Each structure stands twice: as C-alpha cells, then as structure tokens.
C-alpha cells in the first residue's frame, strides 16, 4: 500500500475515534462495550493493533442496538481477528475497566481454544500472539492485569 494512503487512512480513523470519544464524554452517551481475552489452543494471548491508537489491545468494541454482550463479542471477534471457532467463551467475573467512554460496563469475556484467520482492515492493522509471560511493552496496564488475573486462575469457570 502506498505510504500516503496508509497515513491518510490512519489519520482519518484517529480523527473519527477521537471525535466519537469527545462526543461520548460531553453527552454521556457511551454504551455497553465488550472486549475479550482471547487464548489460542497453544495458550498464547491474541492482541490487536488498531489503526487509530498506539499499542496492543484486547479485541472488542461497542454493542449494536438490541445485541446481547455474547452476540456482540462474537461479532466483534469475527470482524477484528477473523474468529473461526473456539472451545469456550464466557463472560468473566472481573470488572472491565475500559477507559473508552464509548464502551462502558463489566463485559470482559474469556475465549479459549480460539482459531482465527486475520485479514487487515480499516480498524485493525495487525494481530499477534504473545506468551502470557511476555506481553509487549506497549500494551495497557489493564491488559497486563487482566492476563495476570486469568493466569492466577481467577477467571470464571467456563
């Protein structure tokens, strides 16, 4: 892809994301959001790199009108990482400390045995798998804390 096109796409997505966040903060209109700690059959953690913000994050996003959190996380994982199949999926009992004003509420899911086929798109530039003991330096503290919590066996039995 041409560098100027990549830059333009990233700039457009960043501006759209920041505008949405500003509107949500001002109006208090943020809705329920979902995100997932996705674990491969080999025990590696799947993280995504967005086109509009730095660092590695859990996949997820906002719910559509009338969508349950379970439906929303499956849709988001199919859109963001190309989720094909999984062994277990369930909502955790740990609160979601999502700082995104568009996505509030305790909707952190644990997905195990995840098989996926990623294709880059406007929102997600890359996915990568990481050892739970060797998460990237540029992932939020909340991701590190959720992974440590999961490793400690505090996750809801699925």
Task: Identify the meaning behind each predicted range.
Residues 94-118, 128, 146-150:
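Active-site-adjacent beta-strand/loop module that shapes the phosphate/pyrophosphate-binding cleft
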Residues 38-39, 47, 111, 129:
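Conserved hydrophobic "DFG−1" position in protein kinase catalytic cores
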Residues 40-79:
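Conserved Nudix-box catalytic region and its N-terminal flanking loop in Nudix hydrolases
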Residues 1-35:
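Acidic, metal-coordinating catalytic segment for phosphate/diphosphate chemistry
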Residues 82-83, 129:
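Glycine-centered C-terminal helix-capping/turn motifs at helix ends
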Residues 54-55, 120-158:
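Nudix hydrolase/Nudix homology domain
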Residues 84-93:
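A short coil-to-beta-strand element that immediately follows conserved catalytic motifs
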């Amino acid at each position: 892809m041409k560098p100027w096109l990549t830059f333009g796409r990233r700039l457009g997505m960043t501006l759209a994301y920041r505008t949405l966040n500003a509107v949500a903060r001002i109006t208090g209109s943020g809705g329920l959001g979902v995100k997932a700690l996705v674990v491969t059959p080999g025990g590696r953690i799947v993280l995504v790199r967005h086109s509009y913000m730095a660092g590695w994050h859990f996949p997820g996003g906002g719910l559509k009108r009338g969508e349950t959190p379970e439906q929303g996380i499956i849709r988001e994982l199919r859109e963001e990482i190309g989720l094909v199949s999984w062994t277990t999926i369930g909502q955790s009992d740990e609160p979601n400390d999502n700082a995104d004003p568009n996505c509030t509420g305790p909707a952190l899911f644990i997905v195990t045995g995840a098989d996926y086929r990623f294709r880059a798109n406007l929102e997600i530039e890359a996915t990568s798998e990481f050892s739970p003991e060797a998460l990237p330096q540029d992932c939020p503290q909340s991701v590190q804390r959720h992974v440590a919590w999961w490793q400690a066996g505090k996750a809801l039995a699925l």
